[in-house]
Curated annotation (Swiss-Prot):
It comes from the Bacteria. Keywords: Cell membrane, Membrane, Transmembrane, Transmembrane helix. It is found in: Cell membrane. This is Uncharacterized protein MG319. It is a multi-pass membrane protein. The lineage of its organism: Bacteria, Bacillati, Mycoplasmatota, Mycoplasmoidales, Mycoplasmoidaceae. NCBIfam families: MPN454_MG319 (NF045771). The keyword Zinc-finger does not apply. The keyword DNA-binding does not apply.
Length: 178
């Protein structure tokens, strides 16, 4: 029974982690706090993992292309919406951070890291931040769940103790009771 409860709680917390990570990406990386303008789950998924998004990196010489080269190649190719899907949208909270997008586009990184820059800007930074925010949200939810379950257990324990005290608090002797 304990194993089942543990697995259920683990699955629930994993769903909470995914939910918080999605909210992080939908709000901060894609734009608006307005619930009607939130990115839909498939939009978030397609932005990172669709065939077009994956082809975009592989067509730009994969890991050998720097972020700057990739964005220039994409501009030359004239993508349909003119948006480099490795960077936050203009209305997002990340775009408002001074120097964040410039750092991603013109990253001054050591040579061995520079060859992975397209993957760093497209996957590692946003998905890593989403995972960390999801983890923080999950820890907060887990903390409150533990508080609630402890208070319920404490209340049950106190009720049981009170029932036992009432049972033995009778004026009759124990022999007559049995």
């Amino acid at each position: 029974m304990r194993l089942f409860r543990f697995l259920f709680k683990l699955c629930f917390l994993l769903l909470v982690l995914v939910g918080f990570a999605y909210l992080f990406l939908a709000i901060f990386y894609f734009g608006s706090l307005n619930p009607f303008e939130l990115a839909q789950p498939m939009d978030v998924f397609n932005r990172f993992f669709s065939k077009e998004a994956l082809d975009n990196i592989s067509s730009n010489n994969g890991a050998t292309a720097t972020a700057q080269t990739s964005s220039l190649l994409q501009l030359l190719e004239g993508s349909s919406n003119g948006l480099d899907n490795r960077f936050p949208t203009e209305k997002s909270a990340f775009y408002a951070i001074p120097g964040y997008v410039d750092f991603l586009k013109n990253a001054k990184l050591p040579g061995f890291v520079e060859q992975f820059t397209p993957y760093l800007t497209k996957y590692v930074i946003p998905l890593g931040m989403a995972f960390v925010s999801g983890l923080i949200g999950t820890l907060i939810v887990n903390f409150f769940l533990n508080k609630i379950t402890r208070s319920i257990k404490r209340r049950k324990r106190n009720m049981k103790k009170q029932e036992q005290e009432e049972y033995y608090d009778d004026s009759r002797s124990r022999r007559k009771r049995n």
